[in-house]
Amino acid sequence: MPLYQTLLRADITCLDYSPDMMGQAREKAERMGLQNVQFRQGDVGALPYEDSSFDIVLSLNGFHAFPDKEAAYRETFRVLKPGGTFCGCFYVSGECRRTDRLIKKVYEPMKFFTPPYETVQSLKVRLEGMYADVQLGNVKSIAWFVCKKVKYAEKMEEGHHE
């Protein structure tokens, strides 16, 4: 969170399905003296926010756990302002067999990870179909991405339709 400490005029909203994770985030923010952070327990598949509410949507290690990934992608797109940035990272399958086996044998039974999973290629296709200026990479089984929600006029010029 050190970067967040420099964003004194930013309004930061943290949402997690797990009350335990929200508690940990709240404690960390308090230790750091952050004042501009709101915490809310909720489901990314049904975000409790108006359309075009956020300049940035950041998802760290979430999409591999979400039970309804399609709803999560739709909702993050919906709440992001045109011209806003969607970024994050999460597990992708097919990059390291050892990690794939660990996920299947350990994390899925514990309900920490929920199939189906993206591959690097499927994530690229998905993000390029929804966003512009897609930057995507991976370090073994963790993919990272940064992309922009284009403004409607820009999308129309490119021949895409929302």
How would you label these PLM feature ranges?
Residues 55-68:
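A short SAM/SAH-binding and catalytic strip from SAM-dependent methyltransferases
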Residues 20, 67-71:
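Short N-terminal helix/helix-N-cap motif within the alpha/beta-hydrolase-1
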Residues 11, 83-85:
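Short glycine-centered segments of the SAM/dcSAM-binding site in methyltransferase folds
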Residues 1-46:
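Class I SAM-dependent methyltransferase SAM/SAH-binding core
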Residues 145-162:
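C-terminal lobe and adjacent flexible extensions of AdoMet/dcAdoMet transferase-like proteins
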Residues 70-82:
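A short glycine-rich, Lys/Arg-flanked "PGG" loop and its adjoining helix->strand segment in the class I
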Residues 45-57:
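A short acidic, Gly/Pro-enriched loop at the edge of an enzyme's catalytic core
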Residues 87-145:
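C-terminal alpha-helical "lid/dimerization" subdomain adjacent to the S-adenosyl-L-methionine
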